[in-house]
Amino acid sequence: MGYATKSPWVIHYDASSCNGCDIEVLAALCPGFDVERFGIINTGNPKHADIFLVTGSVNERNISVVKQIYDQMVEPKVVVACGTCACSGGIFHDCYNVIGGVDQAIPVDVYAPGCAVRPEAIIDGVVQALGILDEKSKALKAAKRGA
């Protein structure tokens, strides 16, 4: 992974969970783990975000929200599923309204499993996402030049 031309912006959404992974996401943003050393900026606006960080499983009620956030993001974009619930539905997998992991609604690029997912795994997933984002950005630029 080379040097980024801009700081990657991350939007976080809790689909539905026990909030254990959300606490770990907050821990990853704290000075103890210093995720900002990678230039990562947290945003609440999907139009500004490069990385979509999702915790929790997708259910009948929130699947449209997950899709809307994803659709509002500008290309190139990367999705990181954080926690067992986001990866596969987790402990809520057999509930009546749970569809499953995030990949049942949108394409997922990086999986960071764990219950609750550790801040180190979240940071590792985001760093992997940065590499994928760089590749997608190069492919998008090449496609624009070729068009």
Residue spans for each PLM region:
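Iron-sulfur-associated redox domains of electron-transfer enzymes in respiratory
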Residues: 1-147
